[in-house]
Amino acid sequence: IIWKDIDYMFIDMPPGTGDVALTIMQSIPVQGVVMVSTPQPMVSMIVEKACHMCEKMEVKVLGIIENMAYLECPNCHERIEFYKKEDVETLCNSTCTKLYGTLPMLDLIRDINEYDAYSKEQQEKVDAYISDIATEVLEDIA
């Protein structure tokens, strides 16, 4: 594929340190990687291994986004921590990376592929969760 002049390319890859990640890092000039984790020890371990692989490949890990970090009550919007909060903090410390932010478990995000288009209200709800994270990532790669 030949792309015209582009500023940024985001590639969503499968988790881990498999052939896909290695091939991309060897084939494309990668300026940085944003890892996405969930607050579970096994996932944190996989992300930590991927961070170490990036280090060996001399690819900078910009930071970590914690996905599915908590539930939000639909009535009162109280944040319900389902997993231990320490997992992502330990991961960031062990990989010397920063935490860009956390995202809740949202049915709207879960069902994103089922919508042809978001309503304005749905888009605003998703934007409220990701806009600060996206802004910080873009600032770091600019």
Where are these regions (language model features)?
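Active-site glycine- and acidic-residue-rich loops that bind
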Residues: P14, P41-I46, E81-F82
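Switch II (G3) loop of P-loop NTPases
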Residues: I1-T23
